[in-house]
Every structure is written in C-alpha cells, then in structure tokens.
Amino acid sequence: MDVCARLALWLLWGLLLHHGQSLSQSHSEKATGSGANSEESTAAEFCRIDKPLCHSEDEKLSFDAVRSIHKLMDDDANGDVDVEESDEFLREDLNYHDPTVKHSTFHGEDKLISVEDLWKAWKSSEVYNWTVDEVVQWLITYVELPQYEETFRKLQLSGHAMPRLAVTNTTMTGTVLKMTDRSHRQKLQLKALDTVLFGPPLLTRHNHLKDFMLVVSIVIGVGGCWFAYIQNRYSKEHMKKMMKDLEGLHRAEQSLHDLQERLHKAQEEHRTVEVEKVHLEKKLRDEINLAKQEAQRLKELREGTENERSRQKYAEEELEQVREALRKAEKELESHSSWYAPEALQKWLQLTHEVEVQYYNIKKQNAEKQLLVAKEGAEKIKKKRNTLFGTFHVAHSSSLDDVDHKILTAKQALSEVTAALRERLHRWQQIEILCGFQIVNNPGIHSLVAALNIDPSWMGSTRPNPAHFIMTDDVDDMDEEIVSPLSMQSPSLQSSVRQRLTEPQHGLGSQRDLTHSDSESSLHMSDRQRLAPKPPQMIRAADEALSAMTSNGSHRLIEGAHPGSLVEKLPDSPALAKKALLALNHGLDKAHSLMELSSPALPSGSPHLDSSRSHSPSPPDPDTPSPAGDSRALQASRNTRIPHLAGKKAAAEEDNGSIGEETDSSPGRKKFPLKIFKKPLKK
C-alpha cells in the first residue's frame, strides 16, 4: 500500500509539474510577443518623432523613459497631458504645495502636452547637454548622495541618461547603480523627474559673481552700520561739548551782567559821595560865614566900646586869630604846593574817555552779535536732533563744526571785551589819581565837543550803549577791586579836588582872602605852579612880629620887629610875598591899635609906624570888609575857641571820614582811599 501510494503521488507531482511548465512557457511566449510588439511600436514612434536619433540605443532608452513619464502623467490615456492632470501630478506625486511656478514652466503657452512635445522640451533643456562632471555635481549638491559619485563616473552617466533615472526601474537602480536603500532610490527618482520636467535646479544656477556681490554687500552694510554708530557717538560727544561751551557762554553773560550791575552800583555810590561832599562844602561855607559874622561882631564890639581893657582884650583875640590864620595858611600852602593839571586837560581827557567808550561799545556789540549767531546755530542743531533722522544728518554735516567754531569765536571775543573793560577801568582810575579830577563822570561827549569848540563832524555818529552785557567765564575769576578813582588820590590831591568842587568865590578859602588884589587875579595858573611857596619863612617872620607885640608892648614892636627886617624874611614868590605882607600888615595894624591903647602919648606919625604902613596897601573902608578881614573870618571859622563852630567842625570832620577821606593835620600821615567794592572773602 505504501509503495502504491508513493507511486501515485509521484505521478501526480509529475503531471502538475509538466502542466506548470507548459503554462509558464505559454505566458513567456505571450509576454515576449507583447514586449516585442511594444518595442516595435516605441521604435516606430521614436523614428517618427526624431529620425536622426532613432538608431541610437541610449536615445531609445531615454525616449522610452520620457514616454513612461508622459504615460504616468496622462491619467485619461488620451495621449495629451492637460492642465488639470499636470496640476494633480505635481500636487500628489511631487508633493508641491504651490505648483504655480512649476506649472507655468511646464506648460508655457501650450495647454496640452504630448509625448512629442515632452521629448522636444527635454532635448532643448540645459540638462540634456550636461557632462558627466555636471551630473556628478548635481548628484552631490542637489540630490545629496555623494556616496554614488564613483558609480556614476564608472557608468559615464551624462545628461542624456537623466530620464532613465526619473522612472521606476529596479534593474537600473538596483543592479546597475547598486542602490540597496529604498529611500535613496526614491529620492534619486524624484530629483531626476523634477530636473527632466522643469530644468536644472536653482541651486545649480548660482554664479560666483552674485555670491561675491552678496558678500561685498554684507560687508558694506556692516561697515555702514559701524560707521553710523561711530558717527552717532561722535556727534553726541560733540553735541555735549558744544552744549557745555554754550552753558559757559550763558554763565559768562550772567557774570558780565552782574559785573555791570556792580559797576552801576559803584557809580551811584560815587555820585552819592560827591553829593555828600557838596553838602559838606556848603556846610563848611556856612560855618565860614558864621565865623565872619562873629569876627565882625567882635570888631564892632572893639570899635564901639570905650573901655580900654575890653578893646585890648578884643585886639589880643584878633591877634590870636591872625596867628591861627597864618598857621592854617601855612598848612594850606603846603597842601597846595603840588602840581596842578590845567583845567583844559580835564575836558580833553574826558573827551578821550568818551571816544574810547564808543569804540569799546562797538567791539562789545560785535561780540554780542557773534554770541547771538552761536545761540541760533545751537538752537537749530537742537531742533534737528528732535527729528527722525536728525542725529544722523547732524553727524554727516559740517554744521556741528561751524557752530563749535562760532561758539569759540564768540567766547574769544567776549574774553577780549572783558580784558578791555578791566584794562580801561584800571587805566582811567590811575589817570584820575594822577590828575586829581574826574574823568569817567563827565557831562557827555556832546557837551565836551561844544565846550572844546570841536567840529562835530570829526567825532562821527555816537552809538547808544547796549542795554545788556555779556562776558566770558573769565569774569568769575576777576579779583580786582573797583575803587572810586577820586578816593584813591594822594593827600595833596584830595584837598585840590575839594577846592575844585567848591564855588569860585568860596572854594579858594583863605588863600583868595589873603591875596585879594588885582595883580593876584592876573597871575596865570602856570606861574602858581612854577613858584613854590615858602611858608616856614613867612610864619617865622609873622611869629617874630606877634611875639614882639604881645610880650614887650608897642615900643618893643616898633623897635624889635621892624617891617624892613620882616620883609627881608618873606619868600621870593611875588604872590606869596603879597599874601604874607597882607597878613603881616593886618597884624601890625592890630599892634598899632594896642599901641594907641597902651601909649596914647605916642605920636601917630612915628617913622617906624609909617615905615611899617608903607609896605601895606591902604586900609579899606569901614563899611567894606577887607581881604584881611575875610581871612580872619575864614580862619576864625576853624578856631576851636567858638563852641558851636567847634562842634560843627567836628561833625563835618566825622562826615568827611565816613566817605573815605581821612583828614589829618600832619602832612606826613598817609590817607587811605575809600574802597567802594571790597573783595569778598573766599570760603
């Protein structure tokens, strides 16, 4: 049974095997026949489309691949690929989300693409003419499969073989290219299909010139950004510096304004001092008038009384007043023995000062204009900075340097104006001290031109003084003290200034009273300056006469103090000799009165008395006060024996000391000037 079963199985297996072989042989014959038919149809179609290349086997394989691609895209198998079929193929098979660009590249103006159109498009493509090196470069850069480079070079695959890579061909990819990885085969197919249909990829179309231009553009952009950053920082620093300079100009302007206010205040105080001096001189003149009235009263009492003792007492008092007047005259002559500047020189110096002030004001106005220009430039830059591109525009323009230059120029001009103001004040103060009269305070340039008889056309047009002032920050460091010019004079000049400020008929004091004659009024000022007095000799001669009168009586006066010997001791100056003779004559007149009281028997025509009277002018009328009487009245005002006059004199001296003129009877004691501004103590 077993053997039979086995034999049956063997027979059955043999029958089945024979039947299978026969079936497979029939199928292979059919396939071979169909393949042969398809190959024949493909060759015929290829020869119809491109007859010159129909005998090339490689071109036939490429055409067959292109035909397979067209068949893959032609869903309805009508022989043409329309717009919808290509769009669907791009979206589904190639996975393009936005196939608009690819779609327009594939179709162009032809909406239906046939196999012939697709083959002609492939032949006209740049990829068709690629060499082996270009295909290898495409494989490395675009497909990113550099491990198959050697295989491609061995097979010498050029651009003509690109369609065979775009279709699914296991023999080509697996056997020929030896790609075992399925993902690599699929990736190569898709990239090749895209290249065949739409041309070379964009990555392979770049040129090095564009890359170089891109790099250069990036470098230029980075450099421009860095340059803009540097310029922005520089402009900010420059703006800070300019704003600092502008603030310095503001401080300088404020400092100059403060200095000008101090100067105006000093001038006002100086005018106040002058007014006080005028009031003081008026008060002194009133005291002199009271002293004259007192002397006149004493004289009337002496003349009107019949009591000899009263008359002798009054005469002694008058002699004491004469002695005191001579002493005061000595001091006044010593104080007036210095040089006096001519009065015309004061007007010329005042005119010179006003002309210099005009030029200073012109220079100061120019400095103010420069400051205003600098301020306007700074304001413009501030406004530009507030705009969108203001900082960049300011950084690349020359306005910053121009404004900086204007600020520095204005600052230098203000420094020059400050130095000129400082030097001018100091110089005119020294000139006022040396000359002994006022120059800065004057009636004005028009009054001076009229007083000096100058043609006004020579002076030109005057400029008004500006209302405000500017100054550099150097004024903050100015340590000079503004001192009243007349308060800095020497002791001899103070008395001369006081004499000039008084009225002509009262300002000369006892000197004019003692020298009241026609010949004295005709003397020129230069004669008085040239002839120096000798007060010690005059006082010494007068003292001898007075001592002789008071000690030995009238006879010893006639014998010991002869007028001839006294005249020999008088000074050489004619003017001062006249002064001394007038004072001495008055003393002799009083001695004669004593002689008449003490010795009535003495004849009035004594030769000694006549000789003494021959050296003096004729006595004045009783109703008219004589010059000697005026001298006695002037000196009696300063005599402390009158109580109420002494109190007024002390008050006047205190007022005089309060304005800075410290008077002292001793000519050797130094008089200190009044400082209107005191230097502030630095903390």
UniProtKB/Swiss-Prot annotation:
Glycans are attached at residues 129, 169. It comes from the Eukaryota. Residues 130-198 form the SAM domain. It is found in: Cell membrane; Endoplasmic reticulum membrane; Sarcoplasmic reticulum; Cytoplasm, Cytoskeleton. Residues 668-683 have a biased composition (Basic residues). Residues 670-683 are annotated as: Required for generation of inwardly rectifying CRAC currents. GO terms for biological process: activation of store-operated calcium channel activity; detection of calcium ion; enamel mineralization; intracellular calcium ion homeostasis; positive regulation of adenylate cyclase activity; regulation of calcium ion transport; regulation of store-operated calcium entry; store-operated calcium entry. Its main location: membrane. Residues 1-22 form the signal peptide. Residues 473-481 are annotated as: Contributes to fast Ca(2+)-dependent inactivation of CRAC channels. Residues 488-535, 597-683 are annotated as: Disordered. Keywords: Calcium, Calcium transport, Cell membrane, Coiled coil, Cytoplasm, Cytoskeleton, Endoplasmic reticulum, Glycoprotein, Ion transport, Membrane, Metal-binding, Microtubule, Phosphoprotein, Sarcoplasmic reticulum, Signal, Transmembrane, Transmembrane helix, Transport. Residues 246-440 form a coiled coil. Residues 62-95, 100-124 form the EF-hand domain. Residues 342-440 are annotated as: SOAR/CAD. Residues 488-497 have a biased composition (Low complexity). Residues 653-664 have a biased composition (Acidic residues). GO terms for cellular component: endoplasmic reticulum; endoplasmic reticulum membrane; microtubule; plasma membrane; plasma membrane raft; sarcoplasmic reticulum membrane. Acts as a Ca(2+) sensor that gates two major inward rectifying Ca(2+) channels at the plasma membrane: Ca(2+) release-activated Ca(2+) (CRAC) channels and arachidonate-regulated Ca(2+)-selective (ARC) channels. Plays a role in mediating store-operated Ca(2+) entry (SOCE), a Ca(2+) influx following depletion of intracellular Ca(2+) stores. Upon Ca(2+) depletion, translocates from the endoplasmic reticulum to the plasma membrane where it activates CRAC channel pore-forming subunits ORA1, ORA2 and ORAI3 to generate sustained and oscillatory Ca(2+) entry. Involved in enamel formation. This is Stromal interaction molecule 1. It comes from Bos taurus. The gene is STIM1.
